[in-house]
Amino acid sequence: MNGGHIQLIIGPMLSGKSTELIRRVRRYQIAQYKCVTIKYSNDNRYGTGLWTHDKNNFAALEVTKLCDVLEAITDFSVIGIDEGQFFPDIVEFCERMANEGKIVIVAALDGTFQRRPFNNILNLIPLSEMVVKLTAVCMKCFKEASFSKRLGAETEIEIIGGNDMYQSVCRKCYIDS
């Protein structure tokens, strides 16, 4: 793929989205591309930077709106974005960056714990050159898991947590519980 484009990595909690994002960004770094990663600043589960659930860390800019980093990223040709579902300006930002010739890689939850589209992240699908939906392992029956199930009774959409608050589950286990 030459020129600007968007790569979208979606899936449930614990499916390896952040790990795949880091792998792709590192691949471009090895090829001497100038890369930057961005994470949602309200996600501070493990500390600063981009973290995977298995505690791998990667340096990242931290913001709540992507438009806040426009000036800081002008010299970068590859932009990795983790937790893309939380950014209200994700669609406009990615389209603008790709149109300016940048490679944009986004990792995001595709659905909420209620199995509804997560904010406007699915609007990136028709704008993306590459879309990958990862699965996790069902934490109840150990089959392929495509959904995230919240363990608590909270009803708000944006509650940031890991396997202490969410489980990846298959369709049957989601419905049965």
Curated annotation (Swiss-Prot):
Q: Give GO terms for biological process.
A: DNA biosynthetic process; thymidine metabolic process
Q: Report the InterPro entries cross-referenced here.
A: P-loop_NTPase, Thymidine_kinase, Thymidine_kinase_CS
Please list the residues that make up the active site: E83 (proton acceptor)
What is the name of the protein in this document?
Thymidine kinase
The keyword Lipid biosynthesis is annotated on this UniProt entry: no
Provide the taxonomic classification. Answer: Viruses, Varidnaviria, Bamfordvirae, Nucleocytoviricota, Pokkesviricetes
Q: What does the entry list as the binding residues for ATP?
A: G11, P12, M13, L14, S15, G16, K17, S18
- Positions binding substrate in this chain are F113, I157, E158, I159, I160, G161
EC number assigned by the record: 2.7.1.21
Sites binding Zn(2+) sit at C138, C141, C170, C173
- Protein family according to the UniProt entry: Belongs to the thymidine kinase family.
Q: Which species expresses this protein natively?
A: Monkeypox virus (strain Zaire-96-I-16) (MPX)
Enzyme's top EC category: transferase
Report keywords, A-Z: ATP-binding, Disulfide bond, DNA synthesis, Kinase, Metal-binding, Nucleotide-binding, Transferase, Zinc
Identify the Pfam families for this entry: TK (PF00265)
- Known catalysed reaction(s)? thymidine + ATP = dTMP + ADP + H(+)
Sample GO molecular function, one term: ATP binding
How it assembles, according to the record, is:
Homotetramer. Two molecules of substrate bind to each enzyme tetramer.
Q: Does the keyword Transferase apply?
A: yes
Q: Outline what the protein does.
A: Phosphorylates thymidine and thymidine analogs, such as azidothymidine (AZT). Part of the salvage pathway for pyrimidine deoxyribonucleotide synthesis.
